C-alpha cells in the first residue's frame, strides 16, 4: 500500500513539474499588444504594437482633452521630475491645467472668456486624488484667475469638497490669491455683441417675454404639459467646442497613483450662478487608484445629470476596457439626448486608454507617455458621428 501511494505521489509531482515547465515556455510575458483592447486607429499606437513594448512602458502618463499641447507638455515635464513620476501626479495636473488658464485655451478656460449674461467671467475647477478619494473644487469663482490652484487649496487646507461664488473668492484671498478682474476687452466685446443681437442665443425657456427675441428681464410663463417637450427642444442652446469647453487632465505614475483635474470658464452667456459638470466629482472627472480615471468635456448641463466619468470608471472596475467604458458611459446620455455634444477619455491604472465622442466631427486629445513613437507627447484624434445613436471609439 505504501509503495502504491509513493508511486501515485511521484506521478503527480512529475505531472505538476511538466505542466509548470510547459507554462513557462508557452506563456509569454504580457506585451503592449496583449495589454491593449480594441482596434488601434492611430499610427503611433500601431508602431508601439509592432515594437512589442511591454505594458510597463505605458507609465507614467499624462492625458488631457483637446489639443492643449502646452498644458500637456508642462504636466509631463513636471511628472518626469521624479523617477516614474512618483509623488508628482498632483503637481502635474494642477500646473498643467493652470497653464491652460494662463493661456486662455480656446477662450473656454481661464479669464477673459465665456462671459455670462451680465458680462462677467467666472471659473470652475476641480482636483481629485485617486489614492484618498479626496476632492477640492471651486465653482462660480469670481475675480480670481488661478481656479485650479484654489481648488487644490480646498483639497489640502479644508475638510470640504467644494466652495462656491464670493465665499470661494474670500477663501482664495485668505490663502494668498489676489483679486483682479477676469474681464478682458475681448470678453467685453463678446458680451456687447451678444446684447446687441437681442441676447441670442441664451439658456432661458418657458418665460416671457419670448427669450428668442428679447433680453428680458423674464418672468415664468405657464406651459401646458403637452407642450413641454416641444418648448424644450425649441429653446435648446446649440453647444459647440468654441462656446462650451473644458480641460480635463489625468496623470498617473509608475505605481498607478492617479490625480485628475478640470478647469473651465463654463458656458458662454450662461445665466449668472450656473455651474456645469467640470467641478462635480464623477461628472467632470473621477479617479480611483484601484481602477483608473476618466475626464469629460462637452455640454455640462446634460453631462452632470449622468456622472459620465464615474460611470466610465465603474465600467472599468467591472472589467470593461477603457474604450468600451467610455462608449458605454456616453450611450447612457445619448439615449435621452440625441442632440447632445460631448467626449470622454478613460484610462485604467495600467495606462491603457480609450476615448469616445458624440455630436462633433472629431475629438482631439493629448497624450504623453513612454509609448510614443516619435517622442513622448503626441496628438490623438477620434472621429465622431453626430446626430445618430452611434459613437466612434478609439482604444489603446
Swiss-Prot record:
Binding site for substrate: 274-277, 297-300
GO molecular function: N4-(beta-N-acetylglucosaminyl)-L-asparaginase activity; peptidase activity
Hydrolase as UniProt keyword: yes
PTM info: Cleaved into an alpha and beta chain by autocatalysis; this activates the enzyme. The N-terminal residue of the beta subunit is responsible for the nucleophile hydrolase activity.
InterPro entries with a match to the protein in the record: Ntn_hydrolases_N, Peptidase_T2
Uppermost EC category: hydrolase
Keyword tags: Autocatalytic cleavage, Disulfide bond, Hydrolase, Protease, Signal
Gene3D superfamilies registered for this protein in UniProt: (Glycosyl)asparaginase
Enzyme Commission (EC) number: 3.5.1.26
Cysteines joined through disulfide linkages: 100-105, 199-215, 357-384
One of the GO BP terms on file: protein deglycosylation
Superkingdom as given in the UniProt entry: Eukaryota
A single cellular component GO annotation: lysosome
Family annotation (Pfam families): Asparaginase_2
Catalytic activity, as annotated: N(4)-(beta-N-acetyl-D-glucosaminyl)-L-asparagine + H2O = N-acetyl-beta-D-glucosaminylamine + L-aspartate + H(+)
Signal peptide: 1-23
Record's keyword annotation contains Oxidoreductase: no
Catalytic residues in the record: 246
Assembly notes: Heterotetramer of two alpha and two beta chains arranged as a dimer of alpha/beta heterodimers.
Similarity field: Belongs to the Ntn-hydrolase family.
Function field: Cleaves the GlcNAc-Asn bond which joins oligosaccharides to the peptide of asparagine-linked glycoproteins.
Name of the featured protein: Putative N(4)-(beta-N-acetylglucosaminyl)-L-asparaginase GE19290
Species of provenance: Drosophila yakuba (Fruit fly)
Amino acid at each position: 500500500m505504501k509503495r502504491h501511494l509513493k508511486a501515485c505521489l511521484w506521478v503527480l509531482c512529475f505531472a505538476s513539474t511538466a505542466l509548470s515547465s510547459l507554462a513557462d515556455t508557452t506563456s509569454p510575458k504580457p506585451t503592449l499588444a496583449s495589454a491593449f483592447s480594441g482596434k488601434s486607429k492611430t499610427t503611433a499606437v500601431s508602431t508601439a504594437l509592432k515594437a512589442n513594448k511591454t505594458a510597463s512602458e505605458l507609465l507614467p502618463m499624462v492625458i488631457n482633452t483637446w489639443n492643449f499641447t502646452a498644458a500637456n507638455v508642462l504636466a509631463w515635464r513636471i511628472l518626469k521630475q521624479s523617477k516614474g513620476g512618483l509623488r508628482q501626479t498632483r503637481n502635474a495636473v494642477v500646473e498643467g491645467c493652470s497653464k491652460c488658464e494662463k493661456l486662455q485655451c480656446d477662450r473656454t478656460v481661464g479669464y477673459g472668456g465665456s462671459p455670462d449674461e451680465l458680462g462677467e467671467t467666472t471659473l470652475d475647477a476641480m482636483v481629485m486624488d485617486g489614492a484618498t478619494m479626496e476632492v477640492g473644487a471651486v465653482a462660480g469663482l469670481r475675480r480670481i484667475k488661478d481656479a485650479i490652484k484654489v481648488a487644490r487649496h480646498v483639497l489640502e487646507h479644508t475638510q470640504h469638497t467644494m466652495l462656491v461664488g464670493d465665499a470661494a473668492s474670500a477663501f482664495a484671498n485668505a490663502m494668498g490669491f489676489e483679486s483682479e478682474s477676469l474681464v478682458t476687452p475681448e470678453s467685453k466685446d463678446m458680451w456687447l455683441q451678444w446684447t446687441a443681437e437681442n441676447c441670442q442665443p441664451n439658456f432661458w425657456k418657458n418665460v416671457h417675454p419670448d427669450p428668442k427675441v428679447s433680453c428680458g428681464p423674464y418672468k415664468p410663463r405657464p406651459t401646458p404639459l403637452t407642450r413641454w417637450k416641444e418648448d424644450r427642444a425649441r429653446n435648446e442652446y446649440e453647444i459647440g467646442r468654441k462656446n462650451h469647453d473644458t480641460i480635463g487632465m489625468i496623470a498617473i505614475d509608475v505605481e498607478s497613483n492617479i490625480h485628475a483635474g478640470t478647469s473651465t470658464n463654463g458656458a458662454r452667456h450662461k445665466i449668472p450662478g450656473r455651474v456645469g459638470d467640470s467641478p462635480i466629482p464623477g461628472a467632470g472627472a473621477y479617479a480611483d487608484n484601484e481602477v483608473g480615471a476618466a475626464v469629460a468635456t462637452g455640454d455640462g448641463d446634460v453631462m452632470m445629470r449622468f456622472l459620465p466619468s464615474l460611470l466610465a470608471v465603474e465600467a472599468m472596475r467591472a472589467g470593461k476596457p477603457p474604450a468600451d467604458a467610455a462608449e458605454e458611459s456616453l450611450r447612457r446620455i445619448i439615449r435621452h439626448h440625441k442632440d447632445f455634444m460631448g467626449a470622454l477619455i478613460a484610462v485604467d491604472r495600467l495606462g491603457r486608454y480609450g476615448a469616445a465622442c458624440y455630436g462633433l466631427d472629431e475629438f482631439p486629445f493629448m497624450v504623453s507617455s513612454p509609448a510614443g513613437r516619435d517622442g513622448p507627447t503626441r496628438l490623438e484624434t477620434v472621429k465622431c458621428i453626430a446626430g445618430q445613436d452611434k459613437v466612434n471609439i478609439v482604444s489603446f
